[in-house]
Swiss-Prot record:
Full protein name: Protein OPI10 homolog
InterPro entries to which the protein is assigned, alphabetical: Hikeshi-like_C, Hikeshi-like_N, OPI10
Signal peptide positions (record): none
Gene Ontology annotations of biological process type: protein import into nucleus
Entry GO CC: cytosol; nucleus
Pfam families (alphabetical): Hikeshi-like_C, Hikeshi-like_N
Top-rank taxon: Eukaryota
Organism in which the protein naturally occurs: Dictyostelium discoideum (Social amoeba)
Length: 217
C-alpha cells in the first residue's frame, strides 16, 4: 500500500504493519539524505476522507515530527528530513505541543536491532479533520523564522529610536554650550563679536581631540 524512496537507495516497500491504522518504515541514513518520497501503491484501496499522515523520528523515537500527508487525491509527497540536531534542540521547547511532538504508537513496535543513525517513518491513518488541525514541521519552522525576523526588526527599530534620541540630546547640549559661550562675550549693546564663534569652534576641536567632551554626556 505504501512505498518509500530515499535517494540513492532503491524503492522500499517493506512497510511494517503496527496496527490497522499504523505503519512504519525504518532505514539507516548512511548517505545523510536530505529528503525522501513516500507514495501510495494502490490508490483505489485508500478510503476517501482519510489520509496517511507522515511522521519522522530519530532514536529513541519519542519525538515524532509531522511532515505532511498523502491520500487518494494526493498519492505522493516529497518530504525534507529534519536534522537530528534540530530535532533535539526543539524537543525541550515543544514538549507540550501536540502538533510537533507526537507519540503515534510507533515506539518499540519494531522488533529489530536498531543501528546508529536510524530513522523511522511513521504512517498514521487519520481523518481530514485531524490533518487540518496540525501544520507540518517545515511550516512551523517557517513561522518561527518569520517571528524571529519580526523580533529582530522590532529590536532594530527600538535601537534606532534610542540612537535618535541620544543624538537629539547631544545636539541640544552642543547648541546650549555654544550659545552660553557666545553670550559670555556680549557687550552692553547686546552684541557679540563674530570671533567668539571661531574661538568656540577651536576650543571644541581641542576638547574633541583630547576626549574632553564631558559636557555632552
Amino acid at each position: 500500500m505504501f512505498a518509500l524512496v530515499v535517494p540513492p537507495y532503491p524503492v522500499n516497500v517493506a512497510v511494517q504493519t503496527i496496527s490497522p491504522t499504523k505503519y512504519c518504515f525504518q532505514f539507516e541514513n548512511r548517505v545523510q539524505a536530505k529528503e525522501f518520497t513516500l507514495f501510495l501503491t494502490d490508490i483505489q484501496k485508500f478510503t476517501p476522507g482519510y489520509n496517511a499522515a507522515i511522521y519522522l523520528a530519530y532514536q529513541p523515537f519519542t519525538d515524532w515530527k509531522y511532515l505532511g500527508f498523502i491520500n487518494s487525491n494526493k498519492p505522493s509527497i516529497i518530504c525534507k528530513i529534519p536534522s537530528e540536531t534540530l530535532d533535539n534542540n526543539n524537543n525541550n521547547n515543544n514538549n507540550n505541543n501536540n502538533n510537533n511532538n507526537i507519540n503515534n504508537g510507533f515506539i518499540n513496535n519494531i522488533n529489530s536491532i536498531i543501528p546508529t543513525e536510524i530513522i523511522q517513518i511513521g504512517i498514521s491513518i487519520e481523518t481530514d479533520l485531524e490533518i487540518q488541525s496540525k501544520p507540518p514541521i517545515e511550516q512551523q519552522q517557517q513561522q518561527q523564522q518569520q517571528q524571529q525576523q519580526q523580533q529582530n526588526t522590532s529590536s532594530t527599530s527600538i535601537n534606532n529610536f534610542i540612537k535618535t534620541e541620544e543624538f537629539k540630546q547631544v545636539a541640544f547640549k552642543l547648541c546650549d554650550n555654544l550659545v552660553n559661550y557666545i553670550l559670555s562675550f556680549s557687550t552692553s549693546n547686546n552684541t557679540v563679536p563674530s570671533s567668539s564663534i571661531n574661538k568656540w569652534y577651536e576650543n571644541f576641536q581641542k576638547k574633541l581631540k583630547n576626549d574632553q567632551l564631558d559636557f555632552l554626556k
